[in-house]
Amino acid sequence: MFDFSIVTTFIDNLLRQTLGLGDFLSILIECVLVGVCILTAYALIAIVLIFMERKVCAYFQCRLGPMRVGPWGIFQVFADVLKMLIKEIFAVDRADKLLYYLAPFLVIIASVGTFSFLPWNKGAHILDFNVGVFLITAVSSIGVLGVFLAGWASNNKYSVVSAMRGAVQMISYEMSLGLCLISAVVLTGTMQVSGIVEAQTGAWNWLIIKGHVPAILAFLVFLVAGNAEANRGPFDLAEAESELTAGYHTEYSGMGFGFYYLAEYLNLFVISGIASTVFLGGWAPLNIGIEGFDNLMNLIPGFIWFFGKTFAVVWLLMWVRWTFPRLRIDQILKLEWKYLMPLSLVILIMMTVCVSFGIHG
């Protein structure tokens, strides 16, 4: 399989040896290139997911979805982006201006930072540390501040109630989310994200397969907790339109609102990407131990495997959103603290026992 690190090594050698640039300029140019790549991927993924959401929603509601602007309505998203870019940005008179303008950037930083840890091909990752799983949970937690500060700084009673709901929900479900990731770390023996994928290469070696029942349960709990962490339906209580107008971002307009809108979809992609990376092998192809089949699967580029698995999980989460009704706040917290949290602890114990006695693939 193609190793993307060859490309990054070539660029580094081009800057340092061929062009003769010093360390500072080389690193600066490389950082700029990485930033451009991240923002470009961020925008493209958000556009694709918004269009996909509209079509999936229409499918489940027996409609066609956007069809007017361009073929199959593919340019509708671009029209909406243009409208959002030119809208006026304003704040209410009694808002805390510093926190009001800071909050959307915190949400973007959290989503982009977490997105940077995803390895979408062999050797293709922006950040890769030996404590990657720990850093993913830490960076993603910054988004809670963005949600809470948006409601608090807006000086709007509906926004404050929404922010309280969103914060308590996100903090609660981070517990189950983290325990499921720890279960994967116990099985693979590493916290490095690229190492987790490498541990899943080989025949029938995806974690959800070799981890047996505990891994399957951890995957399902992770999807539920991740959906709640991203404030997606049926856990979108923080944005309950019939109760709280638009939720914690009621007082935002233009790109202030746009940042929250984009972050929601990137968080959806990040949760799906982490699920596919940790439990479904990430960029690792499906190998079953039959040489001819395995050789054929290995011909498919790693990024196709990664994006294919990720968008399959995205579709599943969209299916859940447009099928189930919104839960109440007491139901959401009861689901986490009375069911998912104890189940996550049991899964972790089961996984530890399986690894200790060698009962895994």
Model-derived segments and spans:
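Selective transmembrane helix interface/packing segments
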Residues: F2-G361
